[in-house]
């Protein structure tokens, strides 16, 4: 009898846990918990938050609650834990999240094509071969730029020390640490998203060795996308559609008001705990970026193939392109009289 009662109690606990997990995933239609980074590559989010564009599109019945992260892994863990409902995030973490849970959806593109390999002034790097025996910084293992860097090294006959090669990868706690690492000669190069290449160059600490856009067809590759949990999408489709509209309207504002948007994004970075950018590198970085609701799906698939070949993920999910749920986006674009984004298949 006691064993039977214990078994029933265990089932009850498991059932309660499952219900709790499901409730977390479903979230609430009265609050949307949105992840964002104090990075310039998240400018549509920064502008949308500061100008109240996203909140306006969500409506009076849904409160926007912002969660700030400094890395894709932090945001990914929050998504997996059900602590947030949606986040702005790069393609590397997106693929990893989808591989782990399958319970996320990319509902819109955000930013394309803004990363470069910068070499430190005086490091003596004039060809890829010169990186042998050198230290190269990037935002962290499995990050979008980490995948790009290691793939490029392989294409040039180089390997990291973890792979038995002689290029040491130095993961950064924060991308802004690259300034200190360059000035202190702690690293010889860095593969980073904007604005950090522009900052390093503006301060005379480095020179641009490679613009990642040159490695992609037509120079288009995803840097940031808008991702939601499928649990939240299923439970609150109207809220998600309003969020997508907020993202589209934020990008439209940036396109119509580029100078004002540049300053708004810079100010919001500080509000969210980041550092303000000086005028010259800010302007240079801003000019490098393309803000688009097109998620550049082909680049996500290639990123996943690259990550798999590097052993960063076990394999490319056969259904990876199903991560794109663009019906809401295309309905919004149709209402605005704008061309639809092709749905990956």
Residue positions per predicted region:
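Pocket-lining segment of extracytoplasmic ligand-binding domains
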Residues: 92-93, 163-166, 174-270
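Mature, folded catalytic cores of secreted/periplasmic enzymes
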Residues: 66, 79, 131, 136, ...
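Short, low-complexity disordered leader/linker segments with a strong preference
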Residues: 1-31, 335-345
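Soluble non-cytosolic domains of exported or imported proteins
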Residues: 70-73, 88, 139-147, 176, ...
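Short, solvent-exposed loop/beta-turn-alpha elements that line the ligand-binding surface or hinge
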Residues: 55-62, 214-219, 287-295
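Short, glycine-/small- and polar/acidic-enriched structural segments
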Residues: 24-174, 188-194, 205
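Conserved C-terminal helix/tail region of periplasmic/extracytoplasmic solute-binding proteins
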Residues: 305-345
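Secondary-structure end/capping motifs
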Residues: 234-315
């Amino acid at each position: 009898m006691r064993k039977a009662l214990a078994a029933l109690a265990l089932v009850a606990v498991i059932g309660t846990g499952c219900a709790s997990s499901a409730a977390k995933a479903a979230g609430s239609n009265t609050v949307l918990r949105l992840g964002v980074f104090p990075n310039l590559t998240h400018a549509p989010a920064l502008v949308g938050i500061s100008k109240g564009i996203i909140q306006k599109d969500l409506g009076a019945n849904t409160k926007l609650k912002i969660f700030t992260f400094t890395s894709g892994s932090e945001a990914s863990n929050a998504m997996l834990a059900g602590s947030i409902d949606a986040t702005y995030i790069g393609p590397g973490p997106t693929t990893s999240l989808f591989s782990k849970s399958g319970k996320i959806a990319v509902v819109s593109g955000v930013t394309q094509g803004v990363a470069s390999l910068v070499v430190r002034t005086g490091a003596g790097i004039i060809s890829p071969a010169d990186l042998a025996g050198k230290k190269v910084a990037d935002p962290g293992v499995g990050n979008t730029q980490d995948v790009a860097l290691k793939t490029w090294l392989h294409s040039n006959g180089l390997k990291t020390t973890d792979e038995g090669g002689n290029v040491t990868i130095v993961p950064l706690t924060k991308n802004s640490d690259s300034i200190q690492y360059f000035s202190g000669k702690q690293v010889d190069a860095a593969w980073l998203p904007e604005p950090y290449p522009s900052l390093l160059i503006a301060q005379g600490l480095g020179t641009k060795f490679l613009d990642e856009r040159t490695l992609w067809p037509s120079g288009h590759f995803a840097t940031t996308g808008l991702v939601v949990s499928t649990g939240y999408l299923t439970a609150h489709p109207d809220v998600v559609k309003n969020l997508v509209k907020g993202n589209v309207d934020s990008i439209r504002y940036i396109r119509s008001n580029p100078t004002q948007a540049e300053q708004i994004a810079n100010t919001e970075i500080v509000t969210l705990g980041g550092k303000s950018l000086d005028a010259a590198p800010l302007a240079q970085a801003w000019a490098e970026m393309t803000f688009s609701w097109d998620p550049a799906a082909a680049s996500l698939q290639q990123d996943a193939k690259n990550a798999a070949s590097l052993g960063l993920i076990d394999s490319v999910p056969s259904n990876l392109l199903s991560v794109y749920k663009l019906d809401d986006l295309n309905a919004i674009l149709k209402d605005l009289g704008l061309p639809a984004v092709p749905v990956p298949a």
